[in-house]
Regions:
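C-terminal, non-catalytic tails of nucleotide-sugar-dependent glycosyltransferases
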Residues: 2-51, 72, 76, 193, ...
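Acceptor-binding helix/loop patch of EC 2.4 sugar-transfer enzymes
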Residues: 97, 156-203
Length: 205
């Protein structure tokens, strides 16, 4: 900062010694969040279109683009909301448009029931799984807990190969030589949760 800016901050701190702490507390508590959420919900819940939950990974690329294109194609017939994983066993609920500021974050450990309640409030009537990378059982159980149907679109080999692309550590095609080869691969590059290949496939298929 310039000397002028530093001098202004020094004056501000002298006149209002609690200013910075109060600003940080305001940002942390976000008292306007509920009002913003209610406006966003009213915007989403127009009542004329069914709401579909698209489950995605936290990466960019073709899968994300497919969801955006699908939401645009079906815009007049359905409203999409997108669920992505976040660090710390959390998930983010957003609209497909990356420029839309609507976002709700839930801790799956502490706020799973709140997530279910929000999805019901949104009127989610179908779950479309596009990718399970970063997600665990709580997200896999959403259709059952919500009492709705689901679809699964396979965009890659993640359901049968934790490495996603049927490649070895040298990035060459593995040859798909059988269960033992897969388990040997998982010794070097473990699957999320440390599952063996048969347990992995049973969970994801």
């Amino acid at each position: 900062k310039s000397p002028r800016e530093r001098a202004a901050m020094d004056t501000l701190r002298r006149l209002h010694p609690r200013y910075e702490a109060e600003v940080l507390a305001f940002v942390r508590d976000d008292p306007a969040r509920l009002a913003r959420t209610m406006v966003d919900l009213a915007r989403i819940l127009d009542g004329s279109r069914p709401v579909i939950l698209a489950v995605l990974h936290d990466r960019q690329g073709g899968t994300e683009r497919h969801v955006h294109e699908l939401a645009a194609l079906l815009h007049d017939r359905a409203q999409f909301v997108v669920l992505r994983p976040l660090p710390g066993q959390r998930v983010s609920l957003r609209l497909p448009d990356p420029d839309d500021a609507f976002e709700l974050v839930f801790s799956l450990a502490d706020e799973y029931d709140a997530l279910l309640s929000m999805l019901r409030q949104l009127g989610v009537c179908h779950v479309h799984y596009h990718h399970l990378l970063g997600h665990g059982k709580p997200v896999m159980q959403l259709p059952q807990r919500l009492g709705v149907g689901y679809d699964f679109t396979a965009h890659d080999y993640f359901s049968i190969c934790p490495q996603i692309s049927l490649t070895r550590r040298d990035n060459r095609y593995c040859g798909e030589e059988g269960v033992q080869q897969c388990n040997d691969c998982l010794v070097q590059s473990p699957a999320p949760g440390g599952l063996d290949i048969l347990s992995w496939r049973a969970r994801h298929t």
